[in-house]
Amino acid sequence: MTRKVSRRLQELQKKVEDRAYEPLAALNLLKETATAKFPESAEAHIRLGIDPKYTDQQLRTTVALPKGTGQTIRVAVIARGEKVAEAKAAGADIAGSEELIEEISKGFLDFDLLIATPDVMPQVAKLGRQLGPRGLMPSPKGGTVTFDLEQAVNEFKAGKLEFRADRTGIVHVLFGKASFSADDLLANLKALQETIDRNRPSGAKGRYWRSVYISATMGPAIEVDINALRDPKLAEA
């Protein structure tokens, strides 16, 4: 069954040529095509030359977006003793120990990110049914299993986010709001590109970068010139 495309999106698609755009031009076009009646996010969809069914070709890491995400996230922390108070002092929206684990097991999920200290992970791991489907399970690679709660809470509140390649080797990630300036979006997209290059899986073979598309939440896909995005001089511009 063919998916029906709205008249609005059809009109916006006419503005996008079938070619790869220089990064800044692509971002200006993203902003121009963000015409929905709500504040849209800027999305990146990056196809990599990896097969995540092999453990040495999986990508899961974090990026600190220099211009932030434009979103207010609710951070929950599971810890013990003084670490609970430390998390609250750092700005965690929710912090607790066994009682929070119990609440989550009963369906409480009123948060966007969960951080846990290593000593409680055996108990948190039992919440896989609740946390797994929503991508909320803490992980060392994602920077969400740590004793340094102050740093973790502050970084994620400031714009650090976790991302991973899906089972087809595509990274889907929000890198700001369409209302950001094109220069600020470029700074975030460049940070994302550098992080993906820095964390290239050891088992990745052949061409690593296959394609990069960006869009506003309800906008058309815009192809970005990969070589131009990866050019080190772009970071100096």
Swiss-Prot record:
Gene3D superfamilies found in the cross-reference section: 3.30.190.20, 3.40.50.790
Keyword Nucleotidyltransferase among record annotations: no
A GO cellular-component term linked to this record: large ribosomal subunit
Keyword entries, A-Z: Repressor, Ribonucleoprotein, Ribosomal protein, RNA-binding, rRNA-binding, Translation regulation, tRNA-binding
Top-rank lineage group of the source organism: Bacteria
GO molecular function terms listed in the Swiss-Prot or TrEMBL record: rRNA binding; structural constituent of ribosome; tRNA binding
Family annotation (Pfam families): Ribosomal_L1
An annotated GO BP: regulation of translation
Protein's job: Binds directly to 23S rRNA. The L1 stalk is quite mobile in the ribosome, and is involved in E site tRNA release.
Subunit: Part of the 50S ribosomal subunit.
Similarity annotation: Belongs to the universal ribosomal protein uL1 family.
HAMAP family per the UniProt record, alphabetical: Ribosomal_uL1_B
Name listed for the protein in its UniProt record: Large ribosomal subunit protein uL1
Organism: Synechococcus sp. (strain ATCC 27144 / PCC 6301 / SAUG 1402/1)
